[in-house]
């Protein structure tokens, strides 16, 4: 069925500078044991070379999920362009039970028609499991490929794909008038652009529920301040600039509130702002430090870091106040939690015996799993479908972004070429 992609104009980001020094995913572990699949190079039906390798993007997406291992083109028994051309037995002989085929056709109006079919080669050989086509301009060819990937991934795994999401992060470059940059890129590092440049540090970006805004911490006024920036036009709204510390913003899933930490009265405590009215209410109090709030799916409950027991651990509390409940018990300390979109688990930065790694806490069973083995891991952020975590870690003298699947099996890194990269934040579905 023909489907014309309708994407908000705001995401063209015409006001922002597109960068050439982009991050790219480099897989380091786990793909070899993933489910094999065939993603045939999409047939180009125009003159010269295709403007984008759509089939290659689909294959990379499925590989980056950690759940699939597309075979190399030189191992494919055939390279069909349509389902009717697929010979199922040739693929099942290689242990492959599903094949993606497709075409890209240029139109007279300058647009492109991208079509794909997902073909079953084992259960019901030759059956088309999913198919779609998209009419897009050249600049949206990657988006069309990610859309196909999302549909294929969901059909085969039962999990909603997150290949059309984005990541925000802070890059500290070497020198220059504005060495700190808040950037946004597609989840795979492509289409990177600058949201904000600053001579002073930028920290802790957080996405709004609809993906149209970013909250973050800036020090441009000489002290910390919390701001919200609209991506479509660059407009900045100052949220908090109280004495001492203003930090750790987190939008509620329903989009109505922003939680953050302030130390205007001495110790760090949690506060929540009603974004419509601007009214701020205090959630925690006392002499302990309470910070790094993150919301549960109900938009009423917060997980956060507190040192009320001596060392940092993760607790939860109702945003309207009440008694806190401790969530983490394993390890010397746990902090900087992020709760999954379904509320079934959270990830933290866990420290024990001098090591600092990303851990997963199952909120149903209480089971804890250490996911990473990198060095000085920080600021984890979960993909909206709950399958992957992005975080920063130390590598050499700098900081880089890393990916790990929430089962700990698949690992990858996103090295940058022009600075240290910190504070990654995964967007909601866009």
Curated annotation (Swiss-Prot):
Signal peptide: 1-21
Keyword GTP-binding among UniProt keywords: no
GO CC annotation: periplasmic space
GO BP field: cell division; protein import
InterPro entries per UniProt: 6-blade_b-propeller_TolB-like, PD40, Tol-Pal_TolB, TolB_N
PANTHER family for the chain: PROTEIN TOLB, PROTEIN TOLB HOMOLOG
Protein name: Tol-Pal system protein TolB
Organism: Pectobacterium carotovorum subsp. carotovorum (strain PC1)
